[in-house]
C-alpha cells in the first residue's frame, strides 16, 4: 500500500481524493486552503476536500498552512515519509524542499503544454477547442512546466465550464490511479516549450460583453458558466443563449425574430438566440416576457 500526501482544495480535488481512498491508497495527510468566509453572513467555511474528510470521519491529518516554506511544515512532511505527493488544484506553489521529498504528481485540467496556469478549462472553451483533457505531470519548480506522465482527452465542444469540470474530475480521478500504479514503468515526456500557452486567473470583469461577435459571446457564455457569467456595461445579464449564426454581418442589437419563449438578436457579426435574461437588480425573466414588459417588438433595438 502506497503512502500518499494529498494537496487539493475544490470539488475537483475531492473527486480524486475519494478515488485514492476507494482504491486502497493510504492517504496520510490532506493539505488544503484555510477556511474562508462565504456568503452574505461571511460564515467561515472549510474547503471542499476538508469538508469531505471531516464529514466522513476519515483518519487523515489536515494541514492548512499559510506557507509551504515553513520549516515545521517541511519537517512534518518528511516525518510522514510519503511515497508520493499528489497535487490537484491546491492553490499554493510547492518549494524545492518539498519537491525533493517524494515524487510530486500534479493533475492539470488541460493537455499540457497548452493552458499552463489558473484557468485551463475556461481557456480551452474560450478558444473554441473541440478536444481537451487532463494530464498527470511530474512537478518541478516552474508553473505547470514539469514532464508529462500520462494524459487522457475528451470532446468538450458545446459544453460549459461546469459540465467540463465534472467530466474532468472523473477523468483525473481515474488517471491518478493509473499513474500511481504504473509510475515505475512510465517514461516522463518533456513538454515542448514552443507550444506553451499560458492562461490567467478569471476575474469578474472578464464576463463583460458587447454585441460585436456572436461566436465570441457564445464561447464566453460557455466558458464563464456559472461564474462570472456574461453581462453588459449596463448590468444586463444573458443567462441562457444559443449561437444561431456566426458569419452574417448587420447592425447589432436588433430583434430579428420573436419566438414563443425567446428572440433572435443581431450582432455585428452573427446572430444569437436569447432565452433568459436579467436586468441589473431585477428578477430573471424568459426572453418573451422581457420583450412584452418593455413593449419591444420585431425590428426594435434591445437597448
UniProtKB/Swiss-Prot annotation:
Task: State a single Pfam family of this protein.
Answer: Formyl_trans_N
- Coiled-coil spans in chain: none
The record's annotation in PROSITE patterns points to: GART
Give the EC number(s) listed in the UniProt record: 2.1.2.9
On whether Protein biosynthesis is a keyword of this UniProt record, the answer is yes
**Coiled coil among the record's keywords?**
no
Q: Which GO MF term does the entry hold, naming one? A: methionyl-tRNA formyltransferase activity
Keywords in UniProt for this one?
A: Protein biosynthesis, Transferase
Q: Known Gene3D superfamilies for this protein?
A: 3.40.50.12230
Task: Look up the record and report any one GO term of the cellular component aspect.
Answer: cytosol
Catalyzed reactions per annotation = L-methionyl-tRNA(fMet) + (6R)-10-formyltetrahydrofolate = N-formyl-L-methionyl-tRNA(fMet) + (6S)-5,6,7,8-tetrahydrofolate + H(+)
What residues bind (6S)-5,6,7,8-tetrahydrofolate, as annotated? 110-113
EC supergroup of this enzyme: transferase
NCBIfam families assigned to the protein according to its UniProt record, in alphabetical order: fmt (TIGR00460)
HAMAP family in the record, alphabetically? Formyl_trans
Family membership: Belongs to the Fmt family.
What function does the entry list?
Attaches a formyl group to the free amino group of methionyl-tRNA(fMet). The formyl group appears to play a dual role in the initiator identity of N-formylmethionyl-tRNA by promoting its recognition by IF2 and preventing the misappropriation of this tRNA by the elongation apparatus.
Q: What is this protein called?
A: Methionyl-tRNA formyltransferase
